[in-house]
C-alpha cells in the first residue's frame, strides 16, 4: 500500500488528518528528534519535513535516519528546492506554486526535480500537489516569488483551486505562511472544498489554537498542517490541536452521513 493510499484510508476513518511540519534548518538534530517524537505522541498522522531555505540532501538524510529510529510515522518531504530530496523519506509532495510570478516555481524546478527523481530517487512516492499561497504568505511567499491572494478575494482563491482540480493534482494546499497572524478563514476553506470535491484539501499557516484547527477541519480541510506551533509551544498545545483536528473531521463525517440519510429518507 502506498503512503497516499494509507493516508486516504485514515482520512476515511477520521474525517481529517494532522501533519506536523518540521524544518531541519531551524533546530539541532536532538531537538528535531524530540519534536518528531512529540508529534507522534500527540497523535499526528504524518511528518512533513522541509523548509523554505537552507536544506540539503545530506542534512535531510541524517535527520531522517535519526528520526526513523525513534518514530513510526510516515515521512513526507516538503521541498523548498530541488535540493530538498532524500531517498530516506517515504514520499514527496511534488508541488507547483500556482500563483508564483516566476515560471521557475511553477514548472522549472519541477522539470529539474523530475529528472533527479527518475535517475536517483525512484524509491520516493510522488504526491502531485498544487500549492496556493494566500493571506500574508510568509517566508515561502518571498522565497517562491508568489503573489499571495488576500483572504477576502475568495473567488480568486477558488478559481486557482479549480485550476488545480482540472489539471489533475491529487492534493491542493492553501498556505497562509509559516507564523502567519491569521489562518485561512473557514469560509474560504468551505468554498474551496465544495469546488474541489474529492481532491485532498490541505490547509496550513497561522493555525495556533485548537479552536482554529477544529473550525478549519469542520469547514472541509482534509489535512491540517502546523509547524511553528510545534517549535514554540508546549507539547500539550500540539496534542490539543491534533485532537481538535480529528474532532472536527469526525463531526464533518457525521454531518455528511446525516445529510445522506436525510436525502434517502426524502426519496
From Swiss-Prot:
Its cofactor is Mg(2+). The keyword Magnesium applies. One of its GO terms (molecular function) is magnesium ion binding. Its EC number is 2.5.1.41. Pathway: Membrane lipid metabolism; glycerophospholipid metabolism. It holds the Pfam family PcrB. It catalyses: sn-glycerol 1-phosphate + (2E,6E,10E)-geranylgeranyl diphosphate = sn-3-O-(geranylgeranyl)glycerol 1-phosphate + diphosphate. It is an enzyme of class 2 (transferase). Sn-glycerol 1-phosphate binds at residues 173-179, 205-206, 227-228. Keywords: Cytoplasm, Lipid biosynthesis, Lipid metabolism, Magnesium, Metal-binding, Phospholipid biosynthesis, Phospholipid metabolism, Transferase. Mg(2+) binds at residues 23, 52. Gene3D superfamilies: FMN-linked oxidoreductases. NCBIfam families: GGGP (TIGR01769), GGGP-family (TIGR01768), PRK04169.1-2 (NF003198). PANTHER family: HEPTAPRENYLGLYCERYL PHOSPHATE SYNTHASE, PTHR40029. Belongs to the GGGP/HepGP synthase family. Group II subfamily. This is Geranylgeranylglyceryl phosphate synthase. It comes from Caldivirga maquilingensis (strain ATCC 700844 / DSM 13496 / JCM 10307 / IC-167).
